[in-house]
């Protein structure tokens, strides 16, 4: 059972809204992008995307359904000959709404609605290129981590011999100090014996 859309109708009446949306869709397909108020752009988006879906199918019945809404035959031809085949591999999301600054006179919120012209399907070469780039970044990170670990081990090894050399020097000085008094005492004892012998 068909139910009316919620909220106020654009233009006041149902017939005015359908005419307004048809004119906006005609301008969108003719120029590729239009600037309008944000509520009109939001209402136009599903309307235009359904027409593009009809154009993708391309049958005579679909063309007649579109002709009920868009009266300009040149725009319908453009829709079926150029726009529909362009979106053959894309499932929805044919339009984009971009908010712009408010209108100067009445401060109405404005938006630009445009057909999305960028290709979304990436070929195998692009996928391979992206995978190789991400792999290269991962390898660089791994190399950096390995370099950091190597530097840490080098610092530890340089610190360890320095500590050992300071410990060895301290031990040598302790040994020299203990050996020096012992040698002096033995020399003094020998001298005293020599003096005793001479007497």
Curated annotation (Swiss-Prot):
<feature type="compositionally biased region" description="Acidic residues">
    <location>
        <begin position="153"/>
        <end position="199"/>
    </location>
</feature>
<feature type="region of interest" description="Disordered">
    <location>
        <begin position="123"/>
        <end position="199"/>
    </location>
</feature>
<dbReference type="Pfam" id="PF01196">
    <property type="entry name" value="Ribosomal_L17"/>
</dbReference>
<dbReference type="GO" id="GO:0006412">
    <property type="term" value="P:translation"/>
</dbReference>
<comment type="similarity">
    <text>Belongs to the bacterial ribosomal protein bL17 family.</text>
</comment>
<dbReference type="InterPro" id="IPR047859">
    <property type="entry name" value="Ribosomal_bL17_CS"/>
</dbReference>
<protein>
    <recommendedName>
        <fullName>Large ribosomal subunit protein bL17</fullName>
    </recommendedName>
</protein>
<keyword id="KW-0687">Ribonucleoprotein</keyword>
<keyword id="KW-0689">Ribosomal protein</keyword>
<dbReference type="InterPro" id="IPR036373">
    <property type="entry name" value="Ribosomal_bL17_sf"/>
</dbReference>
<feature type="compositionally biased region" description="Basic and acidic residues">
    <location>
        <begin position="137"/>
        <end position="152"/>
    </location>
</feature>
<comment type="subunit">
    <text>Part of the 50S ribosomal subunit. Contacts protein L32.</text>
</comment>
<dbReference type="GO" id="GO:0022625">
    <property type="term" value="C:cytosolic large ribosomal subunit"/>
</dbReference>
<dbReference type="GO" id="GO:0003735">
    <property type="term" value="F:structural constituent of ribosome"/>
</dbReference>
<dbReference type="InterPro" id="IPR000456">
    <property type="entry name" value="Ribosomal_bL17"/>
</dbReference>
